Amino acid sequence: MQDEVRERIEAAIPNARVQVEIEGNRASIAVISAHFDGMSRVKKQQEVYACIEDLISSGFLHAVTIKAETP
């Protein structure tokens, strides 16, 4: 599942370096991309969240921590 989440984010966010850790139904996601330049912290998180929204709404993932930064 970690690979699927990483691949979804990499497909949606250009030139992203992505790290995903999943333990049970909790995920920790770190994304670094120049794509985030000029975005607010909330907007960056929304961009990542959109990639996995279906996994959260289905209950597969319950708690998600997102760290999104520019290089």
Give the role of each language-model region.
Residues 1-39, 43-71:
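N-terminal, polar/charged subdomain of small-to-medium soluble alpha/beta proteins
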